[in-house]
């Protein structure tokens, strides 16, 4: 039988293909219709999410499916999708997209792995230093935290640049090679 069913997040595809805007929501539903099958996020596109919302939604899905959702992240190459959400796609501004993606991934892994955390970067100030119930908020906690720690994370390997490979190693992210990436020489550079 099958072990894992993988699907990709895509938006605004009026042509009628790749029309799954929320993998986590779909996988929670499918997990309740199956007994053992795992579901792979191939991939949640970071620049179309706030990293804390993605972390919360994955953690909830992890609990509701009893650990049957495999987390995956991507940078976003469809300009129609990513740019519509107000962020740079790899097709329009690759450098800005990578910078945003890397910071979002840092926030995700802090949220998953630290009991409480803060992050002050170029794009995110988490939490904002605001008064809260009589004190200044300095850190937050992801609630719920993922059921399964450490979170297994996958990412597409497209360019196989040294920077991309080093980034994946830093966070223990596993790579998937397929589609156009495999025909573009990535397979030879990685293997």
What residue spans do the PLM features occupy?
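Active-site-adjacent structural elements that line small-molecule/cofactor binding pockets in enzymes
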Residues: 2-191
């Amino acid at each position: 039988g099958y072990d894992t069913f993988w699907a990709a997040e895509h938006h605004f595809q009026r042509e009628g293909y790749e029309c799954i805007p929320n993998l986590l929501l779909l996988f929670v539903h499918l997990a309740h219709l199956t007994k053992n099958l795992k579901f792979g996020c191939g991939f949640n596109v970071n620049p179309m999410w706030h990293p804390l919302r993605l972390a919360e939604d994955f953690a909830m899905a992890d609990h509701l499916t009893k650990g049957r959702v495999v987390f995956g992240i991507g940078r976003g190459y469809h300009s129609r999708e990513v740019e519509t959400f107000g962020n740079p796609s790899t097709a329009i501004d690759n450098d800005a997209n990578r910078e945003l993606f890397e910071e979002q991934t840092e926030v995700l892994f802090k949220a998953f792995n630290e009991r409480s955390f803060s992050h002050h970067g170029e794009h995110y100030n988490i939490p904002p230093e605001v008064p809260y119930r009589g004190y200044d908020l300095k850190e937050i906690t992801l609630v719920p935290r993922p059921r399964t720690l450490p979170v297994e994370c996958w990412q597409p390997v497209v360019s196989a640049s040294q920077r991309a490979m080093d980034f994946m190693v830093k966070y223990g992210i596993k790579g998937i090679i397929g589609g156009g990436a495999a025909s573009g020489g990535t397979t030879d550079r990685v293997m």
